[in-house]
Every structure is written in C-alpha cells, then in structure tokens.
C-alpha cells in the first residue's frame, strides 16, 4: 500500500504555476497511491465552503476525480484554511481528520498533524490560534458577506507577514519539548507534519531513551514536496515546480 503526504501548498489565484503543478501531481503521482493525506494549508486562505470561487471549484473537481479513481483522501486543517468544513470535504470525497491523528504507518504508531500546535514558544501565535478556534467566532465570520470575509482574510495575511518579519526563526519552529510531549502522550514513535516549511527527517530521543522520528514536509514554492510511504521505504521527495507541471 502506498501513502502520500503533502502540506503547505498555499494555493491562490496569484500562483497559477502552483495550481497547475498540484493538478498535475493529482493526475500522475497521486494516481498510483492508495491514500493521500493533505496536512493543512492547501490554500493560502479559506473564507468558507460557500465561496465557490473558480479556484475552489477547480481544486474540488481535481480532488473528486482522484477520489473517484480509488484513492482515499484525508485532510488535516492548517492555520490558513482551518475553516474548511464538511461541505467542501464531501464535495472532494475527503475525510476530515482531528488536529492530531494517531494511526499505524510502516509498522509504527504514528501521528499526523499540521504542526502549528507544536510551536509553543510563539506565544502570540498560540493566542491567535486559540481565539480563532472559538466556534462562536467562526460562526459569526462565516455569516458575514463574502466581500467582508475576503477583506478580513487579507488583513490577517498582511498582519501575519509583518509579524513573521519581526520574529526570530527559532521562535517560529517547533518547540523540542512540545514535540516530545506529543510523542509521549500518544505513545508514538513517528510524527509527520508541515507548517514550518523546513523539510527534514529528524531523529528524536524520548524521555525513556526510546528513538523516534519526526518528518517535516516542505512547502510548495519553487519546488514541490511530498512524503511517500510504501511497504518498503519512507522517502521525502522534492521536484522543481517548473518540471512538475509539464
């Protein structure tokens, strides 16, 4: 069985090259997989399942086509598209996952997550994350006119960009102790996440001296990144965007 994992594509109308590369990926590499896991931030922002923008419709069709081909699709919310709802998931043929999803991978107890919850040193972001997860606040936002939601999303993006420029790189990475705590709470030895845009396979030593691995998926920008797990290997793969879309 072949399983693929991607995250942090940040699709938007301003990057047609990424849209084309993603659709090509779904029509080629993903067609050979049994399962595809999207671990958050597929879109640059998400203002509601009811938007029905050309981009949303295009991606819905591409994902539904893959699902109809027999590939099971799973989605973990990111910090940019945390309001993706059941309607969009059903239209795509995707299953929505909880914030931390325990499963069995390559004979190991594994955890799948977006990864932003591990960046606990960034207290300002964690405060923002808690506030935006309030159900009543999401309900109010989703009942605003679409034009107003777009403006709010743009303001949040601009604020996020300015905030990142003022933060050190270390504070925006995962906190090592939070990683260990997450591993040990779930009794896992393998973790797969995105968010930090720092693709790497890390060896981790837990408190009991038990070895574990943390695999960080890369973001799609000049290169696309995906993790491939089959019965034999675990491979973190990258490919230039300009060749992936041809």
Curated annotation (Swiss-Prot):
Pathway: Glycolipid biosynthesis; lipid IV(A) biosynthesis; lipid IV(A) from (3R)-3-hydroxytetradecanoyl-[acyl-carrier-protein] and UDP-N-acetyl-alpha-D-glucosamine: step 4/6. Binds 2 Mn(2+) ions per subunit in a binuclear metal center. It is found in: Cell inner membrane. InterPro entries: Calcineurin-like_PHP_ApaH, LpxH-like, Metallo-depent_PP-like, UDP-diacylglucosamine_Hdrlase. Mn(2+) 1 binds at residues 8, 10, 41, 197. Belongs to the LpxH family. This is UDP-2,3-diacylglucosamine hydrolase. It comes from Tolumonas auensis (strain DSM 9187 / NBRC 110442 / TA 4).
């Amino acid at each position: 069985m072949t399983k693929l994992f991607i995250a942090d594509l940040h699709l938007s109308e301003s990057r047609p090259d990424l849209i084309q590369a993603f659709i090509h990926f779904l029509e080629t590499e993903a067609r050979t997989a049994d399962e595809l896991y999207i671990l958050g931030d597929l879109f640059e922002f998400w203002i509601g399942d009811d938007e029905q923008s050309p981009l949303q419709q295009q991606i819905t069709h591409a994902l539904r086509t893959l699902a109809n081909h027999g590939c099971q699709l799973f989605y973990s919310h990111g910090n940019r598209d945390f309001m993706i709802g059941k309607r969009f998931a059903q239209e795509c043929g995707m299953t929505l996952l909880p914030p931390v999803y325990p499963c069995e991978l390559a004979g190991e107890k594994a955890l799948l997550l977006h990864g932003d919850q591990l960046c606990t040193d960034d207290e300002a972001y964690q405060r923002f994350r808690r506030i935006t997860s309030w159900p009543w606040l999401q309900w109010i936002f989703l009942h605003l006119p679409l034009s107003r939601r777009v403006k709010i999303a743009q303001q949040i993006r601009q604020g996020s960009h300015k905030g990142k420029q003022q933060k050190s790189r270390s504070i925006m990475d995962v906190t090592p102790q939070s990683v260990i705590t997450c591993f040990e709470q779930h009794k896992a030895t393998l973790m797969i996440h995105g968010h930090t845009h720092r693709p790497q396979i890390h060896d981790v030593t837990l408190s009991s001296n038990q070895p574990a691995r943390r695999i960080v998926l890369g973001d799609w920008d000049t290169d696309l990144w995906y993790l491939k797990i089959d019965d034999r290997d675990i491979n973190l793969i990258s490919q230039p965007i300009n060749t992936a879309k041809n």
